[in-house]
């Protein structure tokens, strides 16, 4: 995989060693999909078991919503398996790793709003399955479909694939540029980021938390994620998603996942203020696994869960300023203004209301 001019990782064939066997084309999900995105709808889930889930422990605070993926992976490790998920590496790049260490689960918690680098994880998952190990893989719909296609005829009985409900994947180049701009602004090296930190105000108003090393001193910067942080807001405004995300062919049941998990964008009394997960069992194997997990798991109506998660079957519309943004961002030297220039008026209105303590109150009234 190599980055294209917009920074997205794309398949790349090394023609110096290519023997023209055609195997890469045969396993490419994009070239071989039979999915018809026109058939995806809320009703794609009517025959699937759906659940509201949350952990009843402090570990839920570290997760983006109810902690379902954390619980699923922890259970796999406890039974001698390995897990594959996304973490921040030492350079604050999003990468997938495969591990049997429980300590790595904390690195996999919470959202990373950038396309992750898969590396050799597909090959490693395949090798573990051939050795009879239990494996959990968690990724975006396209990453999950890619794994399933890569495995081919390999016995995947011991694999549980979990696909996250996906808005789309931002460019690694954009994240790198934003990181550089912020490091220059705060005169330090970014060493930690949590784009969905819940410790201050809970799930309803998550913060984007950055920690910088400024000459040996830690500097923490927190902004309300979808209200006051330009990077997260512009991601949610679909400004710098991959082109294919605007007509994703891996929505609904088009990715082959055993389980689909994500936010429940509403509230239930039992969950308190720390969030709840929407979980869909897409296969009998996925449903059986869900039932083995600890925590609060309540059978729910698929309409209730899917109606607040339209990204289950819909793709985002392309932001009309996308092309202009990528022209700016590819310059050698950029500033924060190259991002804030694209913020719509509603960003500043939301930010002002949040600063006045009125945003959540108004949101409740409108609901």
Each model region followed by its residue ranges:
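Iron-sulfur cluster-binding cysteine motifs and their immediate structural context
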Residues: 1-12, 23-41, 258-259
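Cysteine-centered iron-sulfur cluster-binding motifs in ferredoxin-type domains/subunits
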Residues: 12-31, 64-67, 142, 241-248
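Low-complexity, highly charged intrinsically disordered N-terminal segments
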Residues: 64, 69-91
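Ferredoxin-like iron-sulfur electron-transfer modules
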Residues: 1-20, 191, 225-236
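Long, compositionally biased charged/polar accessory segments in the mid-to-C-terminal portions
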Residues: 79-82, 188-367
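A short alpha->loop->secondary-structure connector
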Residues: 104-105, 152-164
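Glycine-rich phosphate-binding "P-loop"
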Residues: 93-123
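Short, flexible loop segments at boundaries between secondary-structure elements
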Residues: 158-181
């Amino acid at each position: 995989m190599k980055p294209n001019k917009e920074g997205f990782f794309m398949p790349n064939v090394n023609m110096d060693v290519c023997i023209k066997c055609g195997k890469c084309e045969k396993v490419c999900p994009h070239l071989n999909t039979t999915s018809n995105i026109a058939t995806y709808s809320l009703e794609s889930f009517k025959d699937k078991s759906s659940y509201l889930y949350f952990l009843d422990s402090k570990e839920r605070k570290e997760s983006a919503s109810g902690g379902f993926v954390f619980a699923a992976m922890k259970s796999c490790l406890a039974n001698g398996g390995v897990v594959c998920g996304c973490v921040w590496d030492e350079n604050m790049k999003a990468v997938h790793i495969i591990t049997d260490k429980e300590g790595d689960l904390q690195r996999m918690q919470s959202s990373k709003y950038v396309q992750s680098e898969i590396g050799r994880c597909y090959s490693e998952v395949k090798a573990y399955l051939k050795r009879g190990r239990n494996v959990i893989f968690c990724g975006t719909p396209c990453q999950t479909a890619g794994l399933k296609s890569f495995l081919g005829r390999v016995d995947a009985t011991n694999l549980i694939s979990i696909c996250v409900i996906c808005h789309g994947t931002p460019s690694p180049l954009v994240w790198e540029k934003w990181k550089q701009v912020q490091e220059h602004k705060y005169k330090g090296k970014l060493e930690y980021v949590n784009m969905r930190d819940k410790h201050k105000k809970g799930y309803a108003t998550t913060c984007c938390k950055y920690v910088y090393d400024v000459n040996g001193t830690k500097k923490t910067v927190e902004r309300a994620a979808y209200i006051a942080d330009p990077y997260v807001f512009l991601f949610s405004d679909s400004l710098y998603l991959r082109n294919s995300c605007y007509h994703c062919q891996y929505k609904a049941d088009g990715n082959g996942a055993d389980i689909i998990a994500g936010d429940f964008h509403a509230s239930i009394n039992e969950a308190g203020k720390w969030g709840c997960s929407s979980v869909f069992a897409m296969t009998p194997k996925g449903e059986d696994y869900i039932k083995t997990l600890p925590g609060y798991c309540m059978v729910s109506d698929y309409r209730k869960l899917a109606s607040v998660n339209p990204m289950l079957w819909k793709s985002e519309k392309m932001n009309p300023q996308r092309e202009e943004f990528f022209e700016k961002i590819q310059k050698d030297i950029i500033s924060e203004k190259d991002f804030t220039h694209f913020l719509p008026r509603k960003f500043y209105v939301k930010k002002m209301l949040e600063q006045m303590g009125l945003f959540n109150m108004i949101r409740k009234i409108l609901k």
